[in-house]
Amino acid sequence: MDSNFIFGIIAFTALVLVLAVIILFAKSKLVDSGDITISINNDPEKGITLPAGGKLLGALASKGIFVSSACGGGGSCGQCKVQVKSGGGEILPTELSHISKKEAKEGWRLACQVNVKSSMDVELPEEIFGVKKWECTVISNDNKATFIKELKLQIPEGEEVPFRAGGYIQIEADPHTVNYKDFDIPKEYHEDWDKFNLWRYVSKVDEHIIRAYSMASYPEEKGIIMLNVRIATPPPRNPDVPPGQMSSYIWSLKPGDKVTISGPFGEFFAKETDNEMVFIGGGAGMAPMRSHIFDQLKRLKSKRKMSFWYGARSKREIFYQEDFDQLAAENDNFVWHVALSDALPEDNWTGYTGFIHNVLYENYLKNHEAPEDCEYYMCGPPVMNAAVIGMLKSLGVEDENILLDDFGG
């Protein structure tokens, strides 16, 4: 055998061995061996010890500390912000769309993107330590509109979810397959389902997923959690887009099924002032509106002036009408209005028509003495939210009086 060939093999093998030694040495320096410690809020009782590896979001969850992450750790929702004081390494490009330069300088990171390589020091909001997980039972899952179901969950006996009105929970789902043809939908809602042949869709999920949903229930509705879930069907102009994974899963649930939730989370809370409250909602954005209004009038017995403006396509898309009619009859300080954007001939609708932001402006805010002094609570489709915010800005309403829930629409 040629001596040069043999020498080449020996040299190549030696190079590989040297590189392997360098990598192992670097790893030993960059990653702690054995267990590492995560100091939390500079409180020895809150700190955790665990093996190095994985992401900070998962490390905290493994010790029962659940940080909100509607996307399940994919880095797309930006909810899992925590402050890493030391040990988190450099901020990653995947985080920069959710974290400003100022926040980055202050150590803010996305927990789902921070590698647990060594001991670190983090700051977490105190309310996170009240977050728990529960295995709930489906009580009912009924259509309230063409594309919206009301999911009602039973909390385990002896347990309670200590949430505030306007808060949200996260739902988990294991890998699954959902056939839309198996959905239980009343015939009164079949028109659009037949028109776009939505029954043909199948949602196949190969991984564990987590999503966030605002609660429609309010704190005095003990033992239950109630959600309004709009199914995310592919848009008519792009029918090949996969349907929404979690909404498809939720729509497939039946009474008696078990569902894992975690919470409570939230920041869309009512201000403790005497200012007038104006609620604006559309679609599944009804959920936090119901929670807030019921809480103000039923639990707090609030005397603040308040109105609710809800936008729907047609009469069949209005829900909780009897509940709000009753609240208006029982409370002189509350009124509510519905505007239909696409009323059907059979609706015989004589109420407001058009988009809700225009209706609110033309029929109330245009002649309001001081619209800038009101507090505005809104939740609905992104287009509605943007239109309402633009209208409020034109009236001189400051950001601090515009409160938006991004989940319910």
From Swiss-Prot:
TM helices/strands, residue ranges: 5-25
Q: Where can this protein be found?
A: Cell inner membrane
| Principal EC category | translocase
Q: Give Gene Ontology CC terms.
A: plasma membrane
Which co-factors does it depend on?
Answer: [2Fe-2S] cluster; FAD
Concerning InterPro entries, the annotation shows: 2Fe-2S_ferredoxin-like_sf, 2Fe-2S_ferredoxin-type, Beta-grasp_dom_sf, Cbr1-like_FAD-bd_dom, FAD-bd_FR_type, Flavoprot_Pyr_Nucl_cyt_Rdtase, FNR_nucleotide-bd, NqrF
Which domain of life, per UniProt? Bacteria
* Domain 2Fe-2S ferredoxin-type: residue ranges: 34-128
Primary localization: membrane
Textual note on the cofactor = Binds 1 [2Fe-2S] cluster.
Q: Which GO molecular function terms does the record list? A: 2 iron, 2 sulfur cluster binding; electron transfer activity; metal ion binding; oxidoreductase activity, acting on NAD(P)H, quinone or similar compound as acceptor
Keywords in UniProt for this one? 2Fe-2S, Cell inner membrane, Cell membrane, FAD, Flavoprotein, Ion transport, Iron, Iron-sulfur, Membrane, Metal-binding, NAD, Sodium, Sodium transport, Translocase, Transmembrane, Transmembrane helix, Transport, Ubiquinone
- For the ligand ([2Fe-2S] cluster), the binding residues are 71, 77, 80, 112
What is the stated purpose of this protein?
Answer: NQR complex catalyzes the reduction of ubiquinone-1 to ubiquinol by two successive reactions, coupled with the transport of Na(+) ions from the cytoplasm to the periplasm. The first step is catalyzed by NqrF, which accepts electrons from NADH and reduces ubiquinone-1 to ubisemiquinone by a one-electron transfer pathway.
Q: Which NCBIfam families match?
A: nqrF
What is the name of this protein? Answer: Na(+)-translocating NADH-quinone reductase subunit F
> What's the gene?
nqrF
